[in-house]
């Protein structure tokens, strides 16, 4: 059962390209080594606002729960990832991470 990892970042006006570039340069290159398959970047609302934050949604897929725990261990042990998130936090208004699994009615 694959797991979806969703990052939601509230990005202030005029900073979207900067935050997206941080992900492209410093997070995405090693994501696959952590078992993460990048599936897309989205914004909501569907236009970049110039008077309020726009939410950048970064979506990844991991193969299963074991891959989630392995990824979390690797990220926890990485000073580069810690610095990446500090840099992101210096820009964004807020951020949230969600893990989603398919609901299987049993």
How would you describe each model-predicted region?
Residues 15, 66-68, 105:
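Residue-level signal for secondary-structure boundary sites
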Residues 15-41, 76:
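Short amphipathic alpha-helical segments
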Residues 23, 72, 85:
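Short, flexible helix/strand-to-coil boundary loops that buttress conserved ligand/catalytic motifs
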Residues 3-10, 39-76, 98:
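Short, well-ordered beta-strand segments in beta-rich or mixed alpha/beta enzyme
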Residues 36-55, 81-106:
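Glycine-rich beta-strand-turn "strand-cap" elements at beta-sheet edges
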Residues 1-3, 10-15, 19, 32, ...:
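Short, low-complexity cationic-aromatic patches
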Residues 29, 68, 78-81:
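Generic macromolecular interface patches on structured domains
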Residues 18, 67-70, 83:
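Short, solvent-exposed alpha-helical surface patches in well-structured domains
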